[in-house]
Amino acid sequence: DIKIVDENDKEVKSGEVGEIAIKSPANMRCYLNKKIETDEVLIDGWMHTGDLGFINSQGLVTIVDRKKNIIIRGGENISCLEVEGMLQKHQSILESIVFAVPNERFGEEVGVCINFKKKESLRKEEINQFLNDKLARFKIPTHYWLADDSLPRGATDKLDRIKTRKLCLDNKIKSLL
């Protein structure tokens, strides 16, 4: 069995995005010696995957993002992948990683580390102008960093969001003016 649930573990309507939960005899029973982590993902026999998705009218499941890749800014949910997808459409941007930046007023804001093609450069105002008609205003990054070389990658050559975020917040990658 599969269902899509909201943050209160209530099933959502068809087409609405929520966390994917699975119930099966093949589900794991626990994380070994990790009761707290087990209790977070196994709720009433349902395993919460950490993936966000929806079930369409034909019953097909579409995964849209990871729960951990969601920025919550003042109660609004922002998908890192959605913002990255829009940034990829800019002709000067080679790659980008979007992540949450702590903020006292909103809880989190949108931050991004960018690697430009051919050492091109843009000001953050120019990038914001590009994004204005593509994203809701609250989804547009407020913090920018510029990678001198390619963005950090993990062992499988995937972009490393966690490492990039740490480098940016620790000021090891320069801020884009």
Cite the ranges covered by each PLM segment:
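Conserved ATP/PPi-binding loop(s) of AMP-dependent carboxylate-activating enzymes
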Residues: 10-41, 76-78
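Regulatory helix in c-di-GMP signaling enzymes, encompassing the GGDEF I-site helix
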Residues: 131, 144, 157
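AMP-binding/adenylate-forming catalytic core of the ANL superfamily
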Residues: 8, 24, 29-30, 52-139, ...
